[in-house]
Regions:
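Helix-start/capping segments and mature chain N-termini
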Residues: 1-62, 66-70, 86, 92-280
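Ordered, amphipathic secondary-structure segments that act as subunit-interaction surfaces
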Residues: 74-85, 91-92
Length: 280
């Protein structure tokens, strides 16, 4: 793994960094294919939304792009770039230094090749006990406080279960620990609205746009457990793993249906790779 801090090769930050002390910052995880950052504009748009939500200045786009290009020039053709922006700062207490100053932490790791069976046959998913509590001001963004997902993911260690679904306090399904959820039912594509909590993934937006272009009704709405169990098709997605059908949720089995397959073909695998895509 290659790691830069503020544009220089480094793998440590000061212990007083506010990202470490308070989770005061944002992050993005970007897929790199042959040196190109996929969906870069969408990641930047969410980063900007996060800055507004946290009442922070605009992100340092030019510096981030210079860091990105420098790391990608040294790294593998297919990689995952993680961008962390923290309010560096010093001193004590919750009050931010004025004006806030950014600390840029970027790491580049080789991309993993995910099993083709996950895309062709689907994955097993479970229900999590951990709830996702509402915080509308932070809904949709990728801030550095991710204890909800950490606690949810700690609920199982069975390698055969690929994801867990988290509900809110009202019982509505928010999404997975690392992915957005889609339900196909009665010819429509449904996904949680994420107005109160959750993360609005960059691939989520692409899936919704692709479905609309294919003439499929798309609705952001509250989804219950029963809505999921009575679905015709279920799938999850994120920017690094792509679209993965759900073949089993708890005791209920599903098949990867026509809508999921059409969206997989439209969106494509996470990146072109030998053995991927041909069977979709």
């Amino acid at each position: 793994m290659l790691t830069w801090v503020d544009g220089h090769p480094q793998d440590a930050v000061p212990v007083v960094d506010r990202g470490l002390q308070y989770g005061d910052g944002l992050f993005e995880t970007v897929l790199i294919d042959r040196g190109q950052a996929l969906a870069w504009d969408q990641h930047l748009a969410r980063l900007r939304r996060g800055c507004r939500a946290l009442r922070l200045p605009e992100p340092p786009i030019a510096a981030l792009e210079a860091d990105r290009d420098g790391l990608c020039a040294m790294g593998p053709a297919q990689a995952v770039l993680k961008i962390i922006l923290t309010v560096g700062g010093e001193g004590r207490g919750y009050a931010r230094p004025q004006p806030p100053t950014w600390r840029r932490i970027l790491s580049l790791a080789p991309a993993l090749e995910w099993p083709l069976a996950e895309y062709r046959d689907g994955i097993r998913v479970r229900w999590c006990r951990q709830l996702w509590f509402p915080d509308p001001a932070l809904a949709g963004i990728k801030h550095l406080n991710r204890l909800t997902q950490v606690r949810a993911r700690a609920e199982w260690d069975d390698p055969q279960i690929a994801e867990g679904l988290i509900r809110d306090a009202d019982g509505s399904v928010v999404g997975g620990t690392m992915s957005n959820l889609f339900v196909v039912r009665d010819g429509a594509l449904l996904t949680p609205g994420l107005r109160h909590c959750g993360v609005a993934g960059t691939l989520r937006a692409r899936v919704m746009a692709a479905a609309t272009a294919q003439g499929l009704p798309v609705r952001e709405t509250a989804l219950s457990v029963m809505d999921c169990l009575q679905a015709d098709e279920l799938f999850v997605c994120n920017a690094v793993r792509g679209i993965r059908p759900i073949r089993q949720l708890g005791a209920r089995s599903f098949a990867a249906g026509l809508v999921t397959r059409a969206l997989q073909r439209e969106i494509g695998p996470p990146w072109p790779a030998p053995g991927h895509g041909a069977g979709w």
